[in-house]
C-alpha cells in the first residue's frame, strides 16, 4: 500500500533511483495505491545524465509492494520492496528496460509494454 510521502525504488533505466509519492490518482479521496495503480511522484534521487532529474514531477505505476495483495484464487503476493516504473503522459514506460519482477495485476490494468519488458511476471 502506497500513500502520500511513501518512497519507492525506481525499477527502470530512466536515471531516477528513488521517488516520493505526492498523489494517488483515481478519485478525490483515494488514499492507497497497490500494484498496477498510477501515482504522481517527485524524483528524490537520480544519477547524472539520466532522462529525469532530481525534483522532476512524474507519473509512475506501482509494480511491487511490500504489503501483500490477495489474488482471486486465494493466494497472496508480496515483494521485498516498494517499486515503480516511470510513465510518459500516454501511459507508456519512459525507460527501455525494467529491473526485477513485476506483479501479474499489471496485465489486467493494460500495462502490456511493462509486462513484455519485465524479466519475470509473478
Curated annotation (Swiss-Prot):
Domain of life per record: Bacteria
Pfam (any one): Ribosomal_L14
UniProt KW keywords: Ribonucleoprotein, Ribosomal protein, RNA-binding, rRNA-binding
GO molecular function: large ribosomal subunit rRNA binding; structural constituent of ribosome
Keyword Transferase in annotation: no
Assembly with partners or alone: Part of the 50S ribosomal subunit. Forms a cluster with proteins L3 and L19. In the 70S ribosome, L14 and L19 interact and together make contacts with the 16S rRNA in bridges B5 and B8.
PANTHER family, sorted: 50S/60S RIBOSOMAL PROTEIN L14/L23, LARGE RIBOSOMAL SUBUNIT PROTEIN UL14M
The protein's name in its UniProt record: Large ribosomal subunit protein uL14
